[in-house]
């Protein structure tokens, strides 16, 4: 009984991860990005977060247009509207930046002009 419950939980976790990766890769096209500007605006806290029952390590960047970038350990990053989450990232967590909605500010528009493919970042 315990083995079948563990197997089903593991299988559902795998299915959700695959589904999220599929959505990110095929429905969220790359946008413009400036990694130095993003790293400068890094914010992190210690509040735990979970999505669909899965524990994620997330990071958020705050921008003038109110968009945030969400990241999870082992999965591509996703750009979503809303306030940036404040979560603790473990050292060594690999972050893949996959999509970004650039801010409209004239101050940053020139810096946010490079086309994004994939940028990786390792939390130290």
Curated annotation (Swiss-Prot):
Positions of glycan attachment: 41
Membrane topology, Cytoplasmic segments: 1-2
Extent of the signal sequence: none
Annotated TM spans: 3-23
Subcellular location: Membrane
Keywords: Glycoprotein, Membrane, Signal-anchor, Transmembrane, Transmembrane helix
Residue intervals annotated with topology Extracellular: 24-124
Domain of life: Eukaryota
Gene Ontology CC entries for this record: membrane
Topology versus the membrane: Single-pass membrane protein
Protein name, UniProt field: Putative transmembrane protein ENSP00000320207
Taxon lineage: Eukaryota, Metazoa, Chordata, Craniata, Vertebrata
């Amino acid at each position: 009984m315990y083995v079948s419950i563990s197997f089903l939980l593991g299988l559902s976790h795998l299915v959700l991860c695959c589904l999220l990766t599929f959505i990110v890769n095929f429905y969220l096209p790359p946008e413009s990005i400036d990694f130095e500007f993003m790293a400068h605006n890094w914010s992190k806290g210690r509040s735990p977060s979970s999505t669909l029952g899965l524990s994620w390590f997330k990071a958020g960047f705050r921008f003038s247009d109110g968009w945030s970038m969400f990241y999870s350990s082992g999965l591509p990053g996703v750009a979503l509207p809303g306030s940036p989450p404040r979560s603790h990232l473990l050292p060594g967590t690999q972050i893949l930046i996959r999509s970004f909605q650039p801010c409209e500010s004239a101050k940053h528009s020139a810096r946010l002009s490079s086309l994004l493919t994939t940028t990786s970042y390792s939390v130290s």
